[in-house]
Amino acid sequence: MRIVFVGTPEFAAEILEHLIKNGFNVVGVVTQPDKPRGRGRKVEPTPVKVVAEKHRVPFIQPESINKKEALEFLRSVGPDVIIVASYGKILGEKVLSLPSLGCYNIHPSLLPKYRGASPIQRVLENGEERTGVTIYKMVRELDAGPIALQREISIDPFETFDQLEKRLIELSKEMSIEFLEKLKVGDIELKEQDHSRATYAPMIKKEDLIVDFSKDAESVKNKIRAYDSRPGARAFLGNDEVKLFGVTAIDSSGDEPGLIHYIDREGAWIGTGKGMVKVKYLQLPGKKKLTFWELRNGRLIEEGMKLEGRYES
């Protein structure tokens, strides 16, 4: 079975590496163009490109997978199936109809819930207790195709984005093998999604990262862990936009939204609209993240200061 793999970030790269190491015949790879990344804005290859080069798999990086050059590449490698994971661009009808066995996407949510670009962050932000991975056959509508395989996991109350993403990657790797083995022998049963239950996980905007301390402690906790460690939940300390990481506890007592009540070695208790949250790390502009304890000892932060959740474009 000839496989073309389509994806871009680390999530996809780990799945691709797993397929190749397990002997699957990946005949081609499509990934997004290299882009400037990080503080230095240095152009870096996508993680999927790195894996393709390592294993000498032919790859392309088109601006659009639906243009003539990309379609010619796909036809030349002749896939039986196209596997997509976190590609970041829409596949058109010509691509979807090209492989004889279809195109399948590996999506980190329990579809039809959380269709879209940011399902991991949104399930955490919304305080969901369960999530999972869905492999479905792709159709023109975003994340709306019939389901081939779905697995569910529970979410820890203080689990961060990084931690949950890691577990979902491992689950996706296991499921990709199971799915392709079943596809190889024609043992796939597709189940239509219940479109009336669909919810959406839109692309993250800068304003989504702002912590609103007037909300209750549970909501503030969920906001911080949803963007820990990247790109980081934001607030203002005076005129400085800072990032918050490592929420470790909540308490029903306390108020004064944004007020830093108390700092110890384990973090800072910060007031919310209802209760308090304990946060371990803060990152000042242009600096590495430090514990609140280190910042207090360095006289950069003290009890009684206030964090504000305002948005400045």
UniProtKB/Swiss-Prot annotation:
It catalyses: L-methionyl-tRNA(fMet) + (6R)-10-formyltetrahydrofolate = N-formyl-L-methionyl-tRNA(fMet) + (6S)-5,6,7,8-tetrahydrofolate + H(+). Signal peptide: none annotated. Gene3D superfamilies: 3.40.50.12230. Its EC number is 2.1.2.9. Coiled coil: none annotated. (6S)-5,6,7,8-tetrahydrofolate binds at S109, L110, L111, P112. The keyword NAD does not apply. It holds the Pfam family Formyl_trans_N. GO terms for cellular component: cytosol. Keywords: Protein biosynthesis, Transferase. GO terms for molecular function: methionyl-tRNA formyltransferase activity. Attaches a formyl group to the free amino group of methionyl-tRNA(fMet). The formyl group appears to play a dual role in the initiator identity of N-formylmethionyl-tRNA by promoting its recognition by IF2 and preventing the misappropriation of this tRNA by the elongation apparatus. Belongs to the Fmt family. This is Methionyl-tRNA formyltransferase. It comes from Thermotoga sp. (strain RQ2). The lineage of its organism: Bacteria, Thermotogati, Thermotogota, Thermotogae, Thermotogales.
